[in-house]
Structures are given as structure tokens and as C-alpha cells.
Amino acid sequence: MFSIIIPTFNNLEYLKICIGSIKKNSEFEHEIIPHINEGTDGTEDYLISKNIKYTITKYNSGICEGMNKAAKKATTDYILYAHDDFYFCPGWDTELKKEVDKIGHNDFYLSGTMIGTTGIDTLDCGTNINNFNEKKLLDNYQKLNFYDFQGSTWAPHLIHKDIWNRVGGFSEEFYPGTGSDPDLNMKLWKTNVRIFKGLAKCLVFHFGSVVTRRNNDDIKIKTESGNKGNKIFLLKWGITIKFFKKFYLRSDIPYVSELTEPKKAMNYLFSLILCKINYLYVKYIYNFK
């Protein structure tokens, strides 16, 4: 059904939970393809023992390069990007398949809904593998009441492999990965994709970016004036991620229909001017490279 690509960086115990949840809670059979960054924690031996195909770099290639390498091994028609600290709840794949069948073409970007202590819907079933309460999650996830939402940019996301290849996958200049999701959305927008939909009943529990928290002071992720990925996006596209999500993707409001071009009202024009001022500052005064 889907090729599930999972970049992982020395995070074996969480990866085991992620893969286990896919095997346990999926209605359909899926292809699982992790990309191992470094793999000094025994990840490669584990995947070999489970007969799971993978790609590997002996360095931390980040999310983008890892995704692109692993996606080349995909043999299904659909690429699904997942974090290694996800737990996939029952029914996740049936919801995606129903939506794909309903759309009837390949020009879409679909995502699930992350739940947890920091997700869109909160359900405290633990913050790490040591206090994870799987039973509580399985007993309560169906009680959550959320809506299908507009303008998703988050994992787990699903796109057709032809569309993935059309835009070249993730842009590797966003190493180690921050900002690469909205950049992918922008590339899809430029190729006339207008369905960006988050599905309320496609649920994954997220432990909360375990690896990012472990490395959140890395200069490759942050600069002294904020997030590096935001600056790369601004210099590449001439607008901020916040502007793109607000006026183009109209993120997080209830989903109604596929998107149209943004209305260029006063609020749009004023915000666009601020983007251009920010662009000039970052490029010529801050001299970000």
C-alpha cells in the first residue's frame, strides 16, 4: 500500500515502537524503509534481524538527504514520511486510503494528526518510552474530537511517488531538516497542487521530536537570531513560512475544499511588505549564508 520512510538517528528504542505500531495497527500491508543516520546504537543489526530494508549513511545526513535516499527504494505508488518517535494508532491507514480514493487523482498532500502532550490534540500517555502507556492510548484515542484541517505541513504526510519525484523530494539545503516540510509544500504549490489536508482520524502519538530536543542547541538548527530553516525559506521564496501558511495554505482552520490563490487584501499586502523588509535584513544586513 504505502512506502513508509523513517529517518532515524541513533534512536533505536523509539524506532522499535514505531515499527511495532505499524505492524500491529495497520489494516493494509506496507513497505517500511528507515534511513539510518550513523547507526552507532545497533539500528542496522536490528533492521537486518527483522528483514527490513533500509538505507544508511555513516554520518548524520539529516532528514532531507535520508528521506531522498530511502525514497529511491520505494516500490509502492505512495510515499509516507514518518518520524521515528511516532506510534501509529489503529485505523491510521484506512483513513488515508479512503481519502486517496475519494480524491481520485495524484495532486494532493495529506497528513495525519499528531496527538500527545504537545500534539494538535492532547492525550497524555507518557513523554518517553519509559513512561509510555500504550493501553491508555488505545483505550482513549477514539474519544478525541478534532476536525479535518486545512493547510497541513506536518508528518505523517502522504504524497504520490510521481509527485514526490516531480518536485525532487525534500530540499537538502534545509539540513538537518527544519523548514523542509513547508518548503516541500511550496514546491507542490508551484506545481499546482491545491489539496493540503490534515485528517482528524488518522492519528499518531508523538513523543515530541526526541532527537531534536536532544540536539536543539546545535548551530546547524539555530542561529543567534532564530531558526535557520526559516531564513533559508525566506531567502529561497521571498516570504516567511508564517506568511505562506497563513495566506496560501490557510493552515489549521477546518478543511472545506481545495485551496485557491490568496486574496490580496490589505492584511496580505502589509504582511508581504514585512516579509520583503525581513528578506533584505537577512540577506544584506544579517548576511545569512
Predicted features, each with a name:
Residues 90-128:
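Conserved donor NDP-sugar-binding/catalytic core segment of glycosyltransferases
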Residues 2-14, 18, 25-26, 35:
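A conserved hydrophobic helix/loop-capping motif in glycosyltransferases and polysaccharide synthases
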Residues 127-150, 154:
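Short, flexible, basic/aromatic active-site loop/helix in glycosyltransferases
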Residues 79:
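Short aromatic/hydrophobic "clamp" motif used to bind/position activated sugar donors
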Residues 21, 28, 36-45:
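A conserved acidic beta->alpha catalytic loop
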Residues 150-168, 173-203:
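A short, conserved alpha-helix in the catalytic core of glycosyltransferases
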Residues 115, 175, 197-220, 232:
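Active-site donor/metal-binding and catalytic loop motifs
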Residues 57-74:
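Glycine-rich, basic loop-to-helix element that forms the pyrophosphate-binding segment
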